[in-house]
UniProtKB/Swiss-Prot annotation:
HAMAP family: PEPcase_type1
Cofactor(s) this protein cannot do without: Mg(2+)
Family in the record: Belongs to the PEPCase type 1 family.
Name recorded for this polypeptide: Phosphoenolpyruvate carboxylase
GO (cellular component) term, any one: cytosol
Reactions mediated catalytically: oxaloacetate + phosphate = phosphoenolpyruvate + hydrogencarbonate
């Protein structure tokens, strides 16, 4: 174990040394000395030296405004380098990869050893695998794209340096390259100057596809195929690609007025353009590779006399011409030119697939399987995974926008006000109109801008090539009419196919009512006819946790899923649950394997569809090798959950969860909603107000410009508490509820739940991880520097609560200390704390200076503001998650 860490530690210290030299070259010895002193004090403070902790606080308080930025940047950049070293460690032969035998192989062996599972059953489960990852542009990816590229290169250098047989000359060249990259990063501004537009966000998503997924997906499938051959003697069919990517970038307009119908249209075109660009590179390679002459009669008939000399090349060159014509047309459309569609325009995946597959079959039949299974197979798999649209997009809009649009329409038509009708009247009207042959929208009607936007979006969906839009997600869905309304608006736009429409249930009440809503919908004959036995439902993690606290929210999510699975099974409907979880614990994030196995039995039968948010995209898919490992983890977890589902929880366990849910929700809301001191405390003890200044995502931080916690989006709410290290949303209420149930004499039951019920043990594991990242002395320091003395008792109360919570969680889990069974994560947190602590202390100091200046009516010092932004980004890197 320790040898593993020593490889990581030596890389971290080597990168730190190079950064130190860079700082010295740029700013001189005295700044480096200052940074070194702070680092040593922080290390000693972490080891429990109180005198050094005091000295650390004093040193950072006494920095001049000129020293603030270099010190903040030094620690922030160091954390980015530490994260890069850790990312490399997870795929390096000396690191985690060495002690972590192949996930898929391990899963297959485990399944083979179950007497009740035949090899045929396992094969069928593999063939029904379905994994859809939905990339979202959450404003949590703080790191700029240019810096991400540099870190990818640093990673490549670390990989080459690991080679034992490397010559001295090469070693020196690599070290020089590392120094260049770290110097480039140091001299680059790490904070974006402007908020990204939705199109910028979409381009960020395409960059992930190009730099990592394009290579990672075929590599993952080779890995999967190899393991299946080895363990089951079974080859994957060529057309079998269980993974798809969808994006919310450019499609998610919920609370983001910057995403309009025009933007969505533009992003759809841009996505297709990027696909032609990437496939052209692939086809270019195949043109030079496939110089073979021998071919089957079928292939020769396909190419005719003209192509008989080099049939494979002939087909590839034809495909290349079509791709080039398609790309030119898309480019003109992106510039706003209206052109007729050229002949041979590629709009469907089959048009890409057919010529490639014809080559594949012919090569196989002529005994050239080794060639067929090379680059050609990778390209075929990319056609299945990415295809003509590259990534499909989801459209997401809030339910009230559809209700308002229909209200405006019914008032114009003089048939009443849809908005004020009862649910029964709304449903009757919607079903009547959905069955009607005549259009509902009058020709000469001039709706308001808001309604026009909703109708235009439906128009974009109707006109887009089928298959480029994956689903229409309705946020804040509450009733059956919310779903029917969208179907009616799409029908009016002239959509020619049944678009999957997914209600998103995201508050505690909505989760509790989700099953009733879906049961009513499935009882409508028209609706059953439309969906053809398939239904998608999205479960919201972040908003339910913000509404009720993590314990109550996670139980409501579990029960909603459980009930929906049973309802759909009874009705013969294939249900896909779409999980909207975030990167941080308060937004439902958890290590993938544990999270999936902790869901109700049967929840992955319809495949897994899950959002991958902001900063997590980089941690899980930032490099092709990491993509392979993330996709393998998901694959193993889905197979295991479907073939060896967790047991149904005992009735007594469900009753305990009901109890925990009620108590924890009361405690959570008692503070967050009912304590009059809470909002002023939150505003002053965290950088919540300053966060609004960070040019992160294209979406505003608040749903409504004024208002308390409930109007804040879930992300800034969690981000703010992560910054001051109290991590409040991820634990408040949970420990108090556990303590109460222990006092009622049920500790043995809780211990049994922890042992035998993955759902419950995952909850406790996530609490432990949060507590390991939280730091009470830092949270207290924020109070002392920033909070009015009258509010200090509330801060103290919350910190005491956390201390009590830690004790009760450890007692139930039977652990002597936090993260006892995940030493690798504990090690990683400790490694980073030494560098994150000074950033926290500095941030409290900067907030103090910035607010002081504001109080005195002075203009804020730009050096203070800039350094503050850097500490926010640095702490986010140190915590490995933002909001």
């Amino acid at each position: 174990m320790n040898e593993q860490y020593s490889a990581l530690r030596s890389n971290v210290s080597m990168l730190g040394k190079v950064l130190g030299e860079t700082i010295k070259d740029a700013l001189g010895e005295h700044i480096l000395e200052r940074v070194e002193t702070i680092r040593k004090l922080s290390k000693s403070s972490r080891a429990g030296n109180d005198a050094n902790r005091q000295e650390l606080l004093t040193t950072l308080q006494n920095l001049s405004n000129d020293e603030l930025l270099p010190v903040a940047r030094a620690f922030s950049q160091f954390l980015n380098l530490a994260n890069t070293a850790e990312q490399y460690h997870s795929i390096s032969p000396k690191g985690e990869a060495a002690s972590n035998p192949e996930v898929i192989a391990r899963t297959l062996r485990k399944l083979k050893n179950q007497p009740e599972l035949s090899e045929d059953t396992i094969k069928k489960a593999v063939e029904s695998l379905s994994l859809e990852l939905v990339l979202t542009a959450h404003p949590t990816e703080i790191t700029r794209r240019t810096l991400i590229h540099k870190m990818v290169e640093v990673n490549a250098c670390l990989k080459q340096l690991d080679n034992k047989d490397i010559a001295d000359y090469e070693h020196n060249q690599l070290m020089r390259r590392l120094r260049q990259l770290i110097a480039q990063s140091w001299h680059t501004d790490e904070i974006r100057k402007l908020r990204p537009s939705p199109v910028d966000e979409a381009k960020w998503g395409f960059a992930v596809v190009e730099n990592s997924l394009w290579q990672g997906v075929p590599n993952y499938l080779r890995e999967l195929n190899e393991q299946l051959e080895e363990n089951l003697g079974y080859k994957l069919p060529v057309e079998f690609v269980p993974v798809r990517f969808t994006s919310w970038m450019g499609g998610d307009r919920d609370g983001n007025p910057n995403v309009t119908a025009d933007i969505t249209r533009h992003v759809l075109l841009l996505s297709r353009w990027k696909a032609t660009d990437l496939f052209l590179k692939d086809i270019q390679v195949l043109v030079s590779e496939l110089s073979m002459v021998e071919a089957t009669p079928e292939l020769l008939a396909l190419v005719g006399e003209e192509g008989a000399a080099e049939p494979y090349r002939y087909l590839m060159k034809n495909l290349r011409s079509r791709l080039m014509a398609t790309q030119a047309w898309l480019e003109a459309r992106l510039k706003g030119e209206e052109l007729p569609k050229p002949e041979g325009l590629l709009t469907q995946n089959e048009e890409l697939w057919e010529p490639l597959y014809a080559c594949y079959q012919s090569l196989q039949a002529c005994g050239m399987g080794i060639i067929a299974n090379g680059d050609l197979l990778d390209t075929l798999r990319r056609v299945k995974c990415f295809g003509v649209p590259l990534v499909r997009i989801d459209i997401r809009q809030e339910s009230t926008r559809h209700t308002e649009a229909l209200g405006e329409l019914t008032r114009y038509l003089g048939i009443g006000d849809y908005e004020s009708w009862s649910e029964a009247d709304k449903q009757a009207f919607l079903i009547r109109e959905l069955n009607s042959k005549r259009p509902l929208l009058p020709r000469n009607w001039q709706p308001s801008a808001e309604t026009r936007e909703v109708l235009d979006t439906c128009q974009v969906i109707a006109e887009a090539p089928q298959g480029s839009i994956a689903a229409y997600v309705i946020s804040m869905a509450k009733t059956p009419s919310d779903v029917l309304a969208v179907h009616l608006l799409l029908k009016e736009a002239g959509i020619g196919f049944a678009m999957p429409v997914a209600p998103l249930f995201e508050t505690l009440d909505d989760l509790n009512n989700a099953n009733d809503v879906m049961t009513q919908l499935l009882n409508i004959d028209w609706y059953r006819g439309l969906i053809q036995g398939k239904q998608m439902v999205m479960i919201g993690y972040s908003d339910s946790a913000k509404d009720a606290g993590v314990m109550a929210a996670s139980w409501a999510q579990y029960q909603a899923q459980d009930a929906l699975i049973k309802t759909c099974e009874k009705a013969g409907i294939e249900l896909t649950l779409f999980h909207g979880r975030g990167g941080s614990i308060g937004r439902g994030g958890a290590p993938a394997h544990a999270a999936l196995l902790s869901q109700p039995p049967g929840s992955l039968k319809g495949g897994l569809r899950v959002t991958e948010q902001g900063e997590m995209i980089r941690f899980k898919y930032g490099l092709p090798e990491i993509t392979v490992s993330s996709l393998s983890l998901y694959t193993g977890a889905i197979l295991e959950a479907n073939l060896l589902p967790p047991p149904e929880p005992k009735e007594s366990w469900r009753r305990i969860m009901d109890e925990l849910s009620v108590i924890s929700c009361d405690v959570y809301r008692g503070y967050v909603r009912e304590n009059k001191d809470f909002v002023p405390y939150f505003r002053s003890a965290t950088p919540e107000q300053e966060l609004g200044k960070l040019p992160l995502g294209s979406r505003p931080a608040k749903r409504r410009p004024t208002g308390g916690v409930e109007s804040l989006r879930a992300i800034p709410w969690i981000f703010a508490w992560t910054q001051n290290r109290l991590m409040l949303p991820a634990w408040l209420g949970a420990g108090t509820a556990l303590q109460k149930v222990v006092e009622d004499g049920k500790q043995n039951e809780l211990e049994a739940m922890c042992r035998d019920w993955p759902f419950f043990s995952t909850r406790l594991g996530m609490l432990e991880m949060v507590f390991a990242k939280a730091d009470l002395w830092l949270a207290e320091y924020y109070d002392q520097r920033l909070v009015d003395k009258a509010l200090w008792p509330l801060g103290k109360e919350l910190r005491n609560l956390q201390e009590e919570d830690i004790k009760v969680v450890l007692a139930i889990a039977n652990d002597s200390h936090l993260m006892a069974d995940l030493p690798w994560i504990a090690e990683s947190i400790q490694l980073r704390n030494i560098y994150t602590d000074p950033l926290n202390v500095l941030q409290a100091e900067l907030l103090h200076r910035s607010r002081q200046a504001e109080k005195e009516g002075q203009e804020p010092d730009p050096r203070v503001e800039q350094a503050l932004m850097v500490t926010i980004a640095g702490i986010a890197a140190g915590m490995r998650n933002t909001g």
